Structure formats: C-alpha cells, structure tokens
C-alpha cells in the first residue's frame, strides 16, 4: 500500500492522463475528529494514476438508496466510488457526489461498460451515456464489465474504444473486469494499452491465485469485488459465511477488529484494491476502519488456506449477450 509522504498532493487537472495525486484527504463535512484525520493510502496504476486503496461499491444498491449510501461513504472518508452502467444507479452516484460537499477533484469515479454496448461505436456511446448520468466530463476509470468470450471480437473493439477515450483524455485509466488469463492474453495481443485493473471476485473462499499472479506479472492491479465473500452467502451451502468462519473470527478477536475488517486488511496487505459495499452507515464506517492494524504473515497464510476454489458469481465463460444482454438506457 502506498501512503505517500506526509500531507497530500494536490490533484492534477481532471483532463490529464497523468497524476501527481498521492492522497485523498477526507473533507471536514460531518466528520468525527478520528475520521477527519484519516488519509487514504493509494495504489499506483500502470499509467501513473493513483487509486485509493479502498473504494465504495454500489452493486445491487437500489437507486432510491444510492444517494444516501454514497453521501455517507464520502462523509466517512471514502474517495473512490465504483458503479456500472448495468447497476442502474450511475445518475444517483453523480447526484450523491454533488450533494456530499466533497470536491469532484477528490473523488475517483469508476464505472463499467456493459456487454450490450460492446463494439467500437457502441462503446464510445456508452461512455456518453455513463458520463451524462454521472454528470461529469471525465471518468477516472472506465472498464469492460465482462470478457464476453463467445464474441470476443466485440470485446476487442470495445476496448479499442476505451483506448480512444483514454487518448482523448475523456478517461484517466482503462481496464477490465472478470477477465481470466486466456482472455487477458488475447486482449494484450490485440490491443496497445494494457489494462490498468482487472476487477474480479476475490475473497477468502475464492482466491483465484493463478489469476492474481498473472495480473501482477503484467502490471495489472487486482480489484476485489465481493471482498468479504458476500456472494457466497447464497451460492455455497456447504460452507458457513466468511463472517462466521472461526479462523477469521479468531484473528479478528486478536486485533479487536471485526471479521469484515480482517478480510479487507488481508486484501490490502496482499496488494489488492478492495470495493466493499453497504447501505448501513455503521457498516460503511466499519469497512473503512482498516488502516490502523496489521496482520501477521501467519495470519495472512491462514486466511489463504480457506480457499475452496468455488466461485460465487457467474463463470466468465458463461456470460453471453443472449443470457445477460439487458439494454442500457440513454442518459
């Protein structure tokens, strides 16, 4: 985790593809003294842009709850908001940022292009739709949501569109989500700009070690969605919740932390960016309290050992436009 020097750097102009940003300082709006002094470590992407080590996700957050949840997250100290076109709440994310009192320059916005909008021209227009709903001219990180392996020519064309948006300064970084090594090898061979991130399912019950190594060896930052294993609660009846796992619970007790905080810390110490989600203010604050303790090597290894190899989300190979091709509304 990169924490930078004392203090924090002033963000570069939003249209720059480079960044001298070291720190995302919380604003003073509605903070306790403890939170107002917190500064978020950042991780360097392969193009020099920095991303906060922890983000706030809004997957499956209903639009009517999104504004309050995102405002709460920003007032807690989060400075990265992760949304997606298919979530149906980009507009509410933008509204929350405007209501929060936090400057746009201090918020790292990430969104995802859905498979219905793959292809070169469609992906260019998808940016316009997302930017319009978010109410911004520039998106910090734009990624392809799925590999769509059965029509990978459309995936490559969509990524070419992201490269164009990046070259034009409309996005500060580009990447992918749910790509496996075979998908990444082909993408790297057929495009010019390596993805800055690969947002994937990673949690103690599903670590994806081979993919983590592949991404790291190619300078691709791993972002963990479902970082505390929430996706497993309804997919795998053979295991108890990660929040109830005795190994994790014992480690949490040793540090005076919660199981969720221990799992997030496990990701951070292994170099992954994490995107927890919640609509509950207490949980939002709990998930942010992960920068004041450190797990031992033995504790990290013990959590690694919980891997079941069982995926909670859909298999990337099974994602097709026939099954998942919902239309994305205009801005």
What feature does the model see in each segment?
Residues 5-6, 10-17:
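Compositionally biased, low-complexity flexible segments
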Residues 19-107, 157, 161, 228-231, ...:
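N-terminal binding-site loop/beta-alpha segment at the start of enzyme catalytic domains
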Residues 46, 94-104, 128-135, 188-191, ...:
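Acidic (Asp/Glu)-rich catalytic clusters
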Residues 53-64, 113-120, 151:
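Active-site mouth loops of central-metabolism enzymes
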Residues 62-73, 119-133, 184:
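Short, acidic/polar
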Residues 104-118, 140-147, 202:
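A short, structured active-site edge motif that brings together acidic residues
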Residues 123-144, 164-168, 190:
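CE4/NodB-like, metal-dependent polysaccharide N-deacetylase domain
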Residues 147-331:
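Beta/alpha (TIM)-barrel catalytic core signal, keyed to glycine-rich beta->alpha loops juxtaposed to Asp/Glu
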């Amino acid at each position: 985790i990169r924490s930078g020097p004392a203090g924090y750097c002033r963000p570069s102009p939003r249209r720059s593809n480079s960044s001298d940003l070291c720190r995302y300082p919380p604003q003073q709006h509605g903070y306790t003294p403890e939170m107002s002094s917190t500064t978020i470590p950042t991780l360097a992407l392969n193009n020099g842009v920095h991303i906060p080590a922890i983000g706030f996700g809004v997957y499956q957050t209903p639009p009517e709850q999104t504004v309050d949840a995102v405002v709460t997250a920003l007032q807690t100290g989060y400075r990265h908001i992760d949304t997606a076109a298919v979530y149906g709440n980009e507009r509410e994310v933008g509204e929350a940022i405007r209501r929060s009192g936090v400057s746009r320059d201090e918020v790292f916005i990430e969104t995802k292009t859905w498979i219905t909008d793959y292809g070169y021209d469609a992906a260019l227009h998808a940016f316009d739709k997302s930017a319009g709903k978010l109410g911004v001219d520039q998106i910090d990180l734009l990624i392809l949501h799925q590999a769509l392996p059965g029509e990978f020519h459309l995936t490559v064309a969509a990524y070419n569109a992201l490269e164009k948006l990046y070259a034009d300064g409309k996005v500060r970084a580009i990447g992918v989500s749910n790509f496996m090594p075979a998908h990444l090898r082909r993408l790297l061979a057929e495009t010019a700009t390596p993805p800055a991130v690969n947002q994937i399912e990673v949690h103690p019950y599903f670590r994806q070690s081979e993919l983590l190594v592949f991404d790291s060896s190619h300078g691709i930052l791993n972002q963990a969605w479902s970082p505390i294993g929430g996706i497993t609660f309804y997919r795998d009846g053979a295991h108890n919740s990660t929040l109830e796992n005795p190994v994790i619970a014992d480690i949490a007790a040793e540090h005076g932390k919660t199981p969720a905080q221990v799992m997030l810390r496990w990701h951070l110490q292994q170099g992954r960016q994490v995107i927890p989600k919640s609509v509950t203010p207490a949980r939002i604050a709990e998930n942010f309290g992960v920068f004041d303790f450190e797990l031992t090597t033995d504790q990290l290894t013990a959590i690694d050992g919980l891997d079941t190899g069982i995926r909670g989300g859909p298999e990337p190979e099974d994602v097709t436009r026939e099954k998942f091709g919902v239309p994305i509304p205009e801005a």
